[in-house]
Design a protein with these regions (language model features):
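Short S/T/G/P-rich N-terminal loop/turn motif that feeds into the first structured element of a domain
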Residues: 2-99
Length: 99
């Protein structure tokens, strides 16, 4: 299965959720780190948290390829920011979706 194109230049949709240590701190760092995400071709369509559990984040993004997010998160500079943001990476669930 080719997840890299879906027939042309169409972006891949990523839907995910994860826990953070503190929503306000994580969101501030997420917003401040938008430049590197945009530089990697990653577009954020939605980011929010649960009303009942404010430290549970839900996110919808578009990426150039199915593995773009993983590559971005593994970059040492980005990994450092992600760790400092309080993102509990072991709780992350991401799904590659169609339109």
């Amino acid at each position: 299965m080719n997840l890299l194109g879906f027939g042309g230049n169409k972006m891949v949709k990523m839907v995910g959720n994860f826990e953070v240590k503190d929503w306000a701190h994580w969101k501030k760092m997420f917003d401040e780190h938008s430049g590197p995400r945009e530089g990697a071709g990653i577009k954020t369509n939605y980011v929010g948290n649960e009303l009942e559990n404010p430290n549970k984040v839900h996110i919808v993004m578009e990426t150039p390829a199915a593995d773009s997010m993983q590559k971005f998160m593994q970059n040492p500079e980005n990994a450092k920011v992600i760790a400092e943001s309080g993102h509990k990476q072991e709780t992350t669930v991401m799904s590659v979706c169609s339109d």
